Every structure is written in C-alpha cells, then in structure tokens.
Amino acid sequence: MRGAARLGRPGRSCLPGARGLRAPPPPPLLLLLALLPLLPAPGAAAAPAPRPPELQSASAGPSVSLYLSEDEVRRLIGLDAELYYVRNDLISHYALSFSLLVPSETNFLHFTWHAKSKVEYKLGFQVDNVLAMDMPQVNISVQGEVPRTLSVFRVELSCTGKVDSEVMILMQLNLTVNSSKNFTVLNFKRRKMCYKKLEEVKTSALDKNTSRTIYDPVHAAPTTSTRVFYISVGVCCAVIFLVAIILAVLHLHSMKRIELDDSISASSSSQGLSQPSTQTTQYLRADTPNNATPITSYPTLRIEKNDLRSVTLLEAKGKVKDIAISRERITLKDVLQEGTFGRIFHGILIDEKDPNKEKQAFVKTVKDQASEIQVTMMLTESCKLRGLHHRNLLPITHVCIEEGEKPMVILPYMNWGNLKLFLRQCKLVEANNPQAISQQDLVHMAIQIACGMSYLARREVIHKDLAARNCVIDDTLQVKITDNALSRDLFPMDYHCLGDNENRPVRWMALESLVNNEFSSASDVWAFGVTLWELMTLGQTPYVDIDPFEMAAYLKDGYRIAQPINCPDELFAVMACCWALDPEERPKFQQLVQCLTEFHAALGAYV
C-alpha cells in the first residue's frame, strides 16, 4: 500500500522485554512509555532497531540472561510479563533505566539468571539513606560465578523503621567473561518508601516478688494517651460528619443551578501564530498501540443505527422544557459558522432578573429550510453534556423553543471559538508574528481535553464524537469540550455515510465502533488519540488519503496515521497507545492526564 510504513508485528507490548501483557499497569503511564523503543520517522519504513550492546567477550558469547520472572513482575507492578535486563548477552538499557518502585510492604526482590559458559560476577549495593533502610542483603555470595542452570537469587530490602523517607537503592552487578579484563556493569535502580514504626506501649510490669503481673485490658484504667486517642477520634468523626453535610448541601445546590456564570472576557485579540511545515499524509502500521492496559474493563454501549431519528420533535422539546427561556432575552449578532441548514451566532443573553446585565453566548440554530429531523437532532445532541459541571466541559444553559420560532440552543461564549478553526488559523498565520503557539501550549490543550473526558468517563458518559471540531477555546487557551450538535452540517468533510444512511466521523472512530457500532470510554480514548494528532498537526484531517469505505480494513491490518513532523516520540507514543485494536489495552483517561502532565512539566523544564 502506498504511503504506508510498518512498525513490525501488530499486537506486541510497548514494554521492552515483556511478553503477553494482559493485566493493568498500576505505575504511571509515562514510566511505561519511557521504555518504548524509538519509533521510525514519518513516511519511512521502520529500519531495523539498533542491536543492543552485547556482553564483552573475546570468544563465543556466554549466553547470559538475567530477568524478573512473570510472577515477580506481577507481584511488583501488576503485569503478566517477564522483564528482561539481559537476554542471551543482549542488554536492555530501556529496562535498566527504569527506576522501579518497590511496594512498601515488599521486603524481597527475586532475580532469575543463568549462563551457558563461565561468567564471573561481583555484586554491590548503594543506599542513599542508611537511617531509613539497612544495607541490602543477598542469599548468594557477593562474588562468584553465574550459575550454569536457571537459578533465582534474592535481595532483601528491609527498612529500619526509624524515619519516614523514600530510599533510592542502586544494585551494581559486574559481569566478567572468561576472566578477561573486559567487564560489563549493570546498574539496577529501585525506590522504596520506608515508614517510621509506632512505639508499642509497655503494659507489663514486675511486682515486688519479681513475679509478672497480668495486664487486664478490660478492667485496667485508661491511660492518658488512650483518652487522648479516643477524644481525637471523636473530634475527627464530628469534623468529617460536618464536612459531609456541607458537601451534600453544596452538591444539591450546584445540581439545582441551571444558569452557569460566564466570566469570560468580551474582548478578543488576534494572537500571532507561527506557520508549521507542510507535510504529506503518511501512515504507519504500528505495534505500539497494544500497550498500557486499563485498571478495569470499559462499559460498552451498543448504539442502534439512526436511534436519534426515533425521537420526535415534540419529545425533544419536552426534554429541554425546564431550561427554556423567552426569545426576547436573546440578541443575535455575527454569524460565526454556517452550514447547509445550521448556523452558530455570537449572541447576547439578557439576565432574567436584571435586564441591564448581559452575557455573551454561543447560539446554535437552524435555517428555515431545515427539516424536522434536523431540528430534532440538534436539540437531542445538544443535551449530551447537559447537567454536567466541569471546567473543561461546555454544556448548554438555555434553549428557545417558542412556537413559530426556530429552536435555539444557548451555550456560554468562548471568544476564540471552534478549536479546529483556531488550529487551522494558526497554520495560515505567517511566522513573523511576535507570538506563536508553542508545543507546550498544544500539550496543555490536550491535558484539558483529557481532564474533561476523564470526568465524563467517571460519570459513565460516552461522548462518541470527540474531535477538535467539537471543542472551543478562549484567549487564555482554555479548552472546553462541547456536544456535536450541527457538527455534521458545519464540518461535512469529517463525516461519511457508509451505505447505512448515517453520517459518522469515520476517521475518528475505533474499529469496534466502525464494525459493530459499539461505543465505550475506550472508543472515546481512540478518538482522543486522533484529537491529539489534530493538535500536533494544527488541524489537519487524519487519514485524508484513505477511502472511508476502506477504513475498517485499514485499521484491522494494523495501519495508523503517521507521526506528525516535529512531534516528540514520547507524545506520538501516547497517541499510539490510544489506537490499540483491543479496547481493554487502551489507557484510561486518568492515565493519559497523568502522562501528559508529566510530559508538559518536562517540556517546561527546557523553556
């Protein structure tokens, strides 16, 4: 297939040296992504990965292997995998560079190793806080020969219990082949949190005849520390009870609020933005998507085709009747976007209690030639985020459904408008402007979108049409996710009918959504990966050269959109994680938030 490149066999794990990953990873996603091998450059077939360095030997290789067994990896980080540090003399520097966090309750580490010929070793340890942890102990000699048969040695990491501290442990293993002067040094990094032990209250004493008295906890008088403890518990319970009542009242109050305060400034400014390099759309066949597994399975929703069209206009109006306002409170100004039958206006909303107070708003409406089905779909799809409150969501606040008037949907105003149009404007602006949108800004936008989607996932709300076209932005670069009402009309090139009389965002959809019409938070994660790609390309259309009818087969074969120009490997790895064929192998939105936040902080360190 033209314009396509491959990244090896699909279905392999992102974790180097790991096989058969199934269970969810508890460590942060960025730590797993840090172990990813470098991805190939866009538009080129993946070159063979550079061969890892081998153990130095003057003759045939000694075939040394050292790894963590599947049981050990599962015990430490919850993955069903073997983690190799050395496999048949090949050293995995990705695995060695990872500072593994040891659970605080774990005191022993087990390493599996063997060699086919004579290899001498020397073992040493360093601890950065000897007050918190004793020097590690091993159940083998610190110097000797690597066993010729498969063996396991144990390292004991015991805390002293004297102080609270995170301890950094370095285990250094020197391997020498055939007693030569050449040797290989392997450094294993571990982290463990040690805690201070609570002193036990001594309750036994000797009587005058040196006989031991028996302590009776039932009849013994309470000590001062015991009384203080129970008083503290009582005070804490009372405080928690009061806080719970206050939170419940605030929650009920917020749920009753219909009108959201909109403090967005009315002034807009044109920010100078740089023009990125143009690129030809290319595609990759990626094995990287099959990586970070989620903590739990995703709830799946099967959507029947044309289910929105089964709702009548009367029913749609009935669902929004409680937030309906008078048409007189809305003043329409400029047309921001216009399609075949739909429009989005910049409007002014007059306050119900004080006519002198005005707020800016988005107003979605339809033209006179709009059909009843189109009007119904606008009202129904506008309710997707209704009643949800999050700083990165933009739900509707009011509607106008008066008889004889075309329905209007009102949303809070964001003065830089639609995110996709904003990104494309960034591409068109010349590079000589004083200000330019940075890669760090784009990552910050992605974090905000991931935060909003994480909130939806916790509320078990499936968006089903996440894309840059369904987000808005203001002059502070705050991004909010909106519904997809009128998107089919305003962005017709992003939707395609595959013979079922239903326009769908084919290029943003996961394979299970395309083939089986199944939607879940996992399919939203897939769409987020495409949205992240949109951000990094400043609004380009994904898979633009692929026939929509061939998308399902294309994705099933393992092909994905190529890495954007100037997109860091780590960021493209995040996208690739979102495009795993198996929904269970895609990361959770909360993992994506954490990963992108860490990456954003790393970018800031270089600015």
Swiss-Prot record:
Domain Protein kinase as annotated: residue spans: 330-603
Extent of the signal sequence: 1-25
Gene Ontology terms describing biological process: axon extension involved in axon guidance; axon guidance; axonogenesis; canonical Wnt signaling pathway; cell surface receptor protein tyrosine kinase signaling pathway; chemorepulsion of dopaminergic neuron axon; commissural neuron axon guidance; corpus callosum development
Enzyme class per UniProt: transferase
Active site per UniProt: D465
Low complexity: bias regions: 266-282
Extracellular side: 26-227
Cell compartments where the protein resides: Membrane; Nucleus; Cytoplasm
Modification(s) after translation: Proteolytically cleaved, in part by presenilin, in response to WNT3 stimulation. Cleavage occurs during neuronal differentiation.
GO MF annotations, alphabetized: ATP binding; coreceptor activity; frizzled binding; protein kinase activity; transmembrane signaling receptor activity; Wnt receptor activity; Wnt-protein binding
Binding of ATP, residues: L336, Q337, E338, G339, T340, F341, G342, R343, I344, K364
Domain text: The extracellular WIF domain is responsible for Wnt binding.
Role of this protein: May be a coreceptor along with FZD8 of Wnt proteins, such as WNT1, WNT3, WNT3A and WNT5A. Involved in neuron differentiation, axon guidance, corpus callosum establishment and neurite outgrowth. In response to WNT3 stimulation, receptor C-terminal cleavage occurs in its transmembrane region and allows the C-terminal intracellular product to translocate from the cytoplasm to the nucleus where it plays a crucial role in neuronal development.
Protein name: Tyrosine-protein kinase RYK
Organism this protein belongs to: Homo sapiens
